[in-house]
């Protein structure tokens, strides 16, 4: 079951409020969700509230942020977002290092074959 942290639309026609929820990828936008992680009201002064520790927990469990939810988390919980980005950079560095090592082994094999 793939999970996403995304915004769920609530409220009235001209006063939309969003909930930040953890939901299955296949559930509809305003459908069933697993856990409420915060809310966002673009019309009020104090316009968001997030549960940072729960967001961090679910991101570590493999949940993915949607683009808009990521922007909200970046604004509301910068520590969580910074740690998420640091993990992504570290993963990319490991992949890059493995790719470099593979290319070096491949070049060595080609040079060895050409020398014969």
From Swiss-Prot:
The keyword Cytoplasm does not apply. Pfam families: Ribosomal_S16. The keyword Kinase does not apply. GO terms for biological process: translation. GO terms for molecular function: structural constituent of ribosome. Gene3D superfamilies: 3.30.1320.10. Keywords: Ribonucleoprotein, Ribosomal protein. One of its GO terms (cellular component) is cytoplasm. Belongs to the bacterial ribosomal protein bS16 family. This is Small ribosomal subunit protein bS16. The gene is rpsP.
